[in-house]
Design a protein with these regions (language model features):
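Short, structured secondary-structure elements
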Residues: 21-25, 60, 95-98, 102-104, ...
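Coiled-coil termination/hinge junctions
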Residues: 562-563, 567-578
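C-terminal capping alpha-helices of c-type cytochrome domains
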Residues: 31-33, 103-125, 364-397, 523, ...
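Local sequence-structure signature of Cys/Sec-based thiol-disulfide redox active-site neighborhoods
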Residues: 30-47, 54-60, 320-328, 340
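Extracytoplasmic
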Residues: 392-566
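N-terminal export/targeting leaders of redox proteins
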Residues: 1-35, 235, 254-255, 259-261, ...
Length: 578
């Protein structure tokens, strides 16, 4: 009897081993949420159970939402237990009114099995694949074309060609290589001289020399900057109904120079998003912030400044993420992102960073950086040197290139205060800037007004105005609000026929005495019709504040000559963040 039992005892371990091998070989491989499950969810589930909608209180957008009880109190996903997971029951339900996806094609058996196996394996969630850093230690594949490879990237390309049953093309002729190189790097075809020089150069490094030559050319920056400017929504106009001209070309030049100087992408990013926050920011760094002044501005009459200021801030948030993160963000303004792991509240956390800038959708597009062309700087510096010899010392933030601010501060220290009428801080429903130059205001209608914020009126005795008018008007000077206390008034006469201000002789100067005022007040210029009513009462160019015993009068003719020189040089303006 013992002889018969021994073979049976020997077979038991063998059978156990066979069972284990069979069980292991048939056990499903480790399922990846990103690779296997997320595509199913995005294609067939997320439209009803995600960022926009969360039907039944169930969302597959974030792990904690997917694994918490739904409105029914049931768990859609029970890690390690697909049989008790409500999602599997609903995917397999025979009743079409309860089966998911509702009113759509059911998932295939293979898809349901994948989800079921994933749950049984623990329903492990994974960070979105787009936000997982790539493995820097990937070994380039071996390839039969190893003799053709010149760098590690070539090995990946050749391996893919092998996989697809393709062979690499023959090496291009020198003429074709040069043409490709020129078009790739500069967008311009090579000249006849370029061809002749390249073909005559028998140096093994001739191609590399051509690359270096093109990388150092201004055309390289111009070509590649154009692509970035598209991302920056660059335009020479403001958009919306009037689409008026915008002076922001210095930002375009900054981008070109950044490419040509091979600025690091890190610095390129910092200066555009936060150049104004850098310690002792230079002119160049301030101009870089114009990246986010490319938002549209609405100059249509009757628009609300705050509405379009907020619209610009929202657009800046969306653009920042689209450009630097390669993901849409505008949708998160209303709900969590449908596909990317970005929560609704995170949009407004980012918005808070941008929601502290000074621009307010004004006609004059303040704040602006005012600079001078390189060829004009010596003239301005000469005037400033003179003013500094006669003016009292004033603290001036006059770093790299801030000549305009320095000159303005020096003139103010001499009590010479002349401002552009276009620098108003708020606008009525009718007043606009002259379309072609944006330097003076027009379409001034009866009962319209402009406001200058916190003007120091101490010792100011009168205001002068440079204007042109078809029918004349009455100009009232008021404090604090449009119909606040009136401190002065002046009548403007007729100066022109046709569009006022087109010719120098159409301009006039008028002076209006004002009552004594102490300190800083909001100053309102209120316009009334005279004898006739017309849509456009006048065109206003500048305002001058006359102070008691101004210091500049003591400087006589020489100061006047220097001042004329200063006014002959037109500054350049660029919208910036501040």
């Amino acid at each position: 009897m013992m002889l018969h039992k021994k073979p049976v005892l020997l077979l038991l371990p063998i059978a156990l081993v066979i069972f284990i091998v069979f069980w292991v070989s048939n056990r499903p491989e480790k399922i990846s949420y990103n690779r296997d499950i997320r595509p199913i969810v995005n294609n067939k589930c997320i439209s009803c159970h995600g960022g926009v909608k969360q039907s039944g209180g169930f969302s597959l957008l974030f792990e904690e939402e997917a694994k918490r009880p739904s409105e029914s109190g049931k768990l859609a996903i029970v890690p390690g237990d697909s049989r008790n997971s409500e999602i599997i029951k609903r995917l397999n339900h025979s009743d079409t009114s309860l089966r998911m996806p509702l009113d759509k094609e059911p998932l295939t058996k293979e898809e349901i099995q994948l989800i079921s196996d994933w749950i049984d394996q623990g329903a492990e969630w994974e960070e979105h694949w787009a936000y997982i850093p790539p493995d820097p230690d990937i070994t380039p594949p071996q390839t039969v074309y190893s003799d053709l490879t010149e760098n590690e990237i070539d090995r990946f390309i050749f391996a893919k060609l092998e996989e697809m049953g393709l062979a690499p093309s023959a090496k291009a002729e020198k003429e074709l290589l040069l043409r490709r190189l020129h078009l790739d790097l500069t967008g311009l075809p090579p000249s006849k001289q370029d061809y002749e020089n390249f073909l005559a150069d028998q140096d093994p490094g001739a191609y590399e020399k051509a690359v270096d030559r093109l990388l150092s050319s201004s055309a390289f920056g111009e070509k590649w900057a154009s692509m970035w400017l598209d991302l920056a929504r660059y335009a020479d106009s403001k958009g919306y109904e009037k689409d008026l001209h915008r002076e922001i070309w210095k930002y375009r030049d900054w981008v070109i120079q950044a490419f040509n100087k091979d600025m690091s992408f890190e610095q390129f990013t910092i200066e555009q998003l936060a150049g104004d926050l850098l310690p002792n920011a230079s002119v160049s760094q301030l101009i870089a912030t114009a990246f986010h002044r490319n938002t549209m501005a609405n100059d249509e009459g009757g628009t609300h400044d705050e509405e379009f200021r907020v619209a610009a801030v929202l657009e800046r948030v969306a653009t920042t993420f689209e450009v630097w993160q390669g993901t849409t963000m505008a949708c998160v303004q209303c709900h969590s992102h449908t596909y990317d792991p970005i929560r609704h509240e995170e949009f407004y956390q980012v918005m808070a960073i941008f929601n502290n800038t000074a621009d307010k959708d004004l006609y004059n597009e303040q704040p602006k950086l005012v600079t001078y062309a390189e060829e004009d700087k010596p003239k301005i510096e000469a005037v400033i040197d003179y003013l500094q010899t006669v003016a009292p010392s004033v603290p001036v933030e006059a770093g790299d290139g801030f000549l305009y601010d320095k000159a303005e501060n020096l003139l103010n220290s001499l009590d010479y205060r002349k401002v552009s009428a276009a620098e108003f801080q708020d606008k009525s429903s009718f007043i606009e800037l002259v379309a072609h130059d944006q330097k003076s205001i027009w379409q001034v209608q009866d009962s319209s007004w402009i406001m200058f914020e916190a003007v120091d009126l101490t010792d100011v005795q009168a205001l002068s105005f440079g204007y042109a008018s078809l029918y004349g008007a009455i100009l009232e000077i008021r404090l604090d609000e449009p119909l606040g206390p009136k401190i002065g008034e002046v009548k403007l006469g007729v100066t022109a026929k046709g569009f006022p201000g087109n010719k120098p002789e159409q301009w006039r100067t008028v002076k209006a005495p004002i009552q004594e005022v102490e300190g800083k007040r909001n100053l309102f210029i209120y316009f009334r019709k005279d004898r006739h009513y017309t849509q456009d009462l006048l065109r206003l160019d500048w305002i001058f504040y006359h102070q008691k015993n101004p210091k500049y009068l003591a400087l006589g003719h020489q100061f006047t000559q220097k001042l004329k020189l200063l006014e002959q040089v037109s500054p350049e303006e660029t919208q910036i963040l501040s």
